[in-house]
């Protein structure tokens, strides 16, 4: 079954042909470990976990190498460490922040049903590779030293021979457009506004390492060079797939291409570039100022969103209802709908043995067409094919959820209490209205009598 993927660079869907079918290689940009991951961060984790699972199915579990990095050196980490542990030396407080945040990230994405990557390298473990690449770039005339910084020159790249790609090709921007669109002051040590930092001097107390390019003072890497170094170390100069969020296309991924191709004199860093779309919450951009900023942990463990906690399988399915390249609107209604499907499928497959699911796989091989995939899951349910549905859920990392293991949210509890009060005062019109509102939330109300003959109301998640 042929796999077709949309390539951000060529702007077209193409047949996927790995450089080496016995060693399929994928790199995805991972978290900067300074705080809990938010729901927008969960989207690429889930999307590329599905792709990882599909590649393992198509090429064999032992023939796919998935690398997702951990960024553990960054200004945001330094600021968080100084704020949370003011009494400790900065290096020690940074270690506490990064180790704790990495554990939190793993707990959260494990709950979402995601497999661990084959390799999960930390940036600080690859400083030597970063220095090697930087030295090559300086020697090749693509980078220069200024005021103890090392900067990359996109202009030098575009003036070089035709083997190299054009800087700006991935983001479909020209250098002139980038210069015209610059909205920040250009540092005085830069030769050109588009030049970007490969290495910079460390401030007193900050993490620091011996510098490349003959610089006497110690320093630390820029963000972009980290991923070039880690992908090179674990996947080679050129590999099959590079993924991440659409917000990383420029400047991060554009700069990765520039660094890697110029350092290794290659025309491509990755054969296929894949990017997932943006996420908004209830129709608005997610932001702390709007009060709609929500972390994975808050969705799993608190009642912040929709007035209740949510199971990881529900979050996963809700994320997959929208095609990965399209923007997604994260809503409580979508979570209720996903949960209803999960409960139904879980009940239906509880005694099933995982079977083949060719139609589901066919949908996924069409550029991860998860809306079509979900339609196929519903079709299997309607056709009574429990084994096939069970196999599809297993392939997709959708864990069965036992009915009753999800807490009833505060809003629903309040509505049920209000309906009970309405029935007690014989306000049946209000009682029926609340019943319909609960039904719209996926909660079925049943009225009956207890062993003493007194009225009693029970509820269940509707099928």
Swiss-Prot record:
Cofactor(s), names only, from the UniProt record: Zn(2+)
GO MF annotations, alphabetized: ATP binding; cysteine-tRNA ligase activity; zinc ion binding
Catalysed transformations (reactions): tRNA(Cys) + L-cysteine + ATP = L-cysteinyl-tRNA(Cys) + AMP + diphosphate
Entry keywords, A to Z: Aminoacyl-tRNA synthetase, ATP-binding, Cytoplasm, Ligase, Metal-binding, Nucleotide-binding, Protein biosynthesis, Zinc
Cofactor binding, per record: Binds 1 zinc ion per subunit.
Subcellular location: Cytoplasm
SUPFAM superfamilies assigned to the protein according to its UniProt record, in alphabetical order: Anticodon-binding domain of a subclass of class I aminoacyl-tRNA synthetases (SSF47323), Nucleotidylyl transferase (SSF52374)
Binding site for Zn(2+): 29, 227, 252, 256
Chain positions recorded as ATP binding sites: 288
KW Isomerase (keyword) present: no
Gene3D superfamilies registered for this protein in UniProt: Cysteine-tRNA ligase, C-terminal anti-codon recognition domain, HUPs
Residue numbers covered by motif 'HIGH' region: 31-41
Principal subcellular localisation of the protein: cytoplasm
Gene Ontology annotations for the cellular component aspect, listed alphabetically: cytosol
Gene Ontology BP, a term: cysteinyl-tRNA aminoacylation
Enzyme nomenclature, EC number: 6.1.1.16
CDD domains, sorted: CysRS_core
Motif segment ('KMSKS' region): 285-289
PANTHER family attached to this UniProt entry: CYSTEINE--TRNA LIGASE, CYTOPLASMIC, CYSTEINYL-TRNA SYNTHETASE
Family assignment from sequence similarity: Belongs to the class-I aminoacyl-tRNA synthetase family.
UniProt subunit comment: Monomer.
Protein name: Cysteine--tRNA ligase
Source organism of the structure: Rhodopseudomonas palustris (strain BisB5)
Gene from which the chain derives: cysS
